[in-house]
Swiss-Prot record:
Residues 23-123 form the Cytochrome c domain. It comes from Rhodomicrobium vannielii (strain ATCC 17100 / DSM 162 / LMG 4299 / NCIMB 10020 / ATH 3.1.1). GO terms for molecular function: electron transfer activity; heme binding; metal ion binding. PANTHER family: CYTOCHROME C. Heme c binds at residues 35, 38-39, 101. This is Cytochrome c2. GO terms for biological process: photosynthesis. The keyword Mitochondrion does not apply. SUPFAM superfamilies: Cytochrome c.
Length: 125
Protein backbone atom coordinates (compact mmCIF):
# COMPACT_ATOMS: atom_id res chain seq x y z
CA UNK A 1 0.00 0.00 0.00
CA UNK A 2 2.81 2.39 0.92
CA UNK A 3 4.58 1.62 -2.38
CA UNK A 4 1.40 2.44 -4.29
CA UNK A 5 1.10 5.82 -2.55
CA UNK A 6 4.74 6.61 -3.29
CA UNK A 7 4.26 5.62 -6.94
CA UNK A 8 1.14 7.80 -7.18
CA UNK A 9 2.94 10.81 -5.70
CA UNK A 10 5.89 10.23 -8.03
CA UNK A 11 3.59 9.99 -11.05
CA UNK A 12 1.82 13.19 -10.03
CA UNK A 13 5.15 15.00 -9.73
CA UNK A 14 6.29 13.78 -13.13
CA UNK A 15 2.95 14.74 -14.68
CA UNK A 16 2.96 18.22 -13.15
CA UNK A 17 6.57 18.83 -14.18
CA UNK A 18 5.78 17.71 -17.72
CA UNK A 19 2.76 20.03 -17.81
CA UNK A 20 5.08 22.99 -17.27
CA UNK A 21 7.59 21.66 -19.77
CA UNK A 22 4.76 21.37 -22.30
CA UNK A 23 4.04 25.11 -22.12
CA UNK A 24 4.35 26.87 -25.48
CA UNK A 25 5.66 30.45 -25.14
CA UNK A 26 4.25 31.44 -28.56
CA UNK A 27 0.76 30.33 -27.54
CA UNK A 28 1.38 31.86 -24.11
CA UNK A 29 2.02 35.24 -25.70
CA UNK A 30 -1.42 35.03 -27.31
CA UNK A 31 -3.09 34.09 -24.01
CA UNK A 32 -1.13 36.86 -22.24
CA UNK A 33 -2.89 39.46 -24.43
CA UNK A 34 -5.79 39.38 -21.96
CA UNK A 35 -3.29 40.19 -19.18
CA UNK A 36 -1.96 43.24 -21.03
CA UNK A 37 -4.92 45.26 -19.81
CA UNK A 38 -3.03 45.49 -16.51
CA UNK A 39 0.48 44.04 -17.05
CA UNK A 40 3.34 44.90 -19.39
CA UNK A 41 6.39 42.93 -20.52
CA UNK A 42 9.42 43.81 -22.59
CA UNK A 43 12.27 46.31 -22.50
CA UNK A 44 10.02 49.39 -22.26
CA UNK A 45 7.51 47.89 -19.78
CA UNK A 46 6.30 50.10 -16.95
CA UNK A 47 4.04 49.37 -13.98
CA UNK A 48 0.41 50.26 -14.58
CA UNK A 49 -2.70 48.79 -13.01
CA UNK A 50 -0.50 45.74 -12.36
CA UNK A 51 3.25 45.23 -11.98
CA UNK A 52 5.68 44.61 -14.84
CA UNK A 53 6.04 40.89 -15.52
CA UNK A 54 9.65 40.83 -16.78
CA UNK A 55 11.81 38.40 -14.78
CA UNK A 56 8.78 37.31 -12.75
CA UNK A 57 9.66 33.59 -12.78
CA UNK A 58 11.85 33.03 -9.73
CA UNK A 59 11.10 36.39 -8.13
CA UNK A 60 9.63 37.03 -4.69
CA UNK A 61 5.94 38.00 -4.74
CA UNK A 62 5.18 41.61 -3.90
CA UNK A 63 8.76 42.79 -4.33
CA UNK A 64 8.90 44.38 -7.79
CA UNK A 65 9.94 48.06 -7.70
CA UNK A 66 7.53 50.76 -8.79
CA UNK A 67 4.28 49.04 -7.87
CA UNK A 68 2.09 49.48 -4.80
CA UNK A 69 1.26 45.89 -3.81
CA UNK A 70 -1.44 44.88 -1.36
CA UNK A 71 -0.25 43.96 2.12
CA UNK A 72 -1.53 40.45 1.40
CA UNK A 73 0.82 40.10 -1.58
CA UNK A 74 3.80 41.71 0.18
CA UNK A 75 3.35 39.37 3.15
CA UNK A 76 2.49 36.22 1.18
CA UNK A 77 6.01 34.78 1.34
CA UNK A 78 5.56 33.34 -2.15
CA UNK A 79 8.23 32.89 -4.78
CA UNK A 80 6.93 32.82 -8.34
CA UNK A 81 8.07 29.40 -9.52
CA UNK A 82 6.09 27.41 -12.08
CA UNK A 83 3.94 25.60 -9.50
CA UNK A 84 3.05 28.77 -7.60
CA UNK A 85 2.31 30.70 -10.80
CA UNK A 86 0.10 27.84 -11.98
CA UNK A 87 -1.96 27.89 -8.78
CA UNK A 88 -2.13 31.69 -8.71
CA UNK A 89 -3.11 32.03 -12.36
CA UNK A 90 -5.86 29.46 -11.81
CA UNK A 91 -7.42 31.35 -8.88
CA UNK A 92 -5.53 34.43 -7.61
CA UNK A 93 -7.83 35.16 -4.66
CA UNK A 94 -7.61 31.59 -3.35
CA UNK A 95 -3.79 31.71 -3.31
CA UNK A 96 -3.44 35.27 -1.97
CA UNK A 97 -6.66 36.34 -0.23
CA UNK A 98 -6.67 40.14 -0.24
CA UNK A 99 -4.76 40.49 -3.52
CA UNK A 100 -5.60 43.56 -5.60
CA UNK A 101 -5.73 41.43 -8.74
CA UNK A 102 -9.31 41.38 -10.00
CA UNK A 103 -8.75 38.74 -12.70
CA UNK A 104 -10.74 35.60 -11.86
CA UNK A 105 -8.13 33.23 -13.28
CA UNK A 106 -7.24 31.00 -16.20
CA UNK A 107 -9.18 27.76 -15.80
CA UNK A 108 -7.49 25.91 -18.69
CA UNK A 109 -4.29 24.19 -17.45
CA UNK A 110 -2.69 24.37 -20.91
CA UNK A 111 -3.32 28.13 -21.11
CA UNK A 112 -1.62 28.51 -17.73
CA UNK A 113 1.35 26.38 -18.81
CA UNK A 114 1.65 28.43 -21.99
CA UNK A 115 1.53 31.77 -20.15
CA UNK A 116 4.15 30.55 -17.66
CA UNK A 117 6.38 29.45 -20.55
CA UNK A 118 5.93 32.89 -22.14
CA UNK A 119 6.68 34.72 -18.89
CA UNK A 120 9.85 32.64 -18.48
CA UNK A 121 11.11 34.22 -21.73
CA UNK A 122 10.47 37.79 -20.57
CA UNK A 123 13.61 39.43 -19.28
CA UNK A 124 14.52 43.06 -18.95
CA UNK A 125 14.36 45.88 -16.48
Amino acid sequence: MKAIKIAMVGAALVWSASAYAAGDPVKGEQVFKQCKICHQVGPTAKPGVGPVQNNVVGSKAGSRPGFNYSDAMKNSGLTWDEATLDKYLENPKAVVPGTKMVFVGLKNPQDRADVIAFLATQHGQ
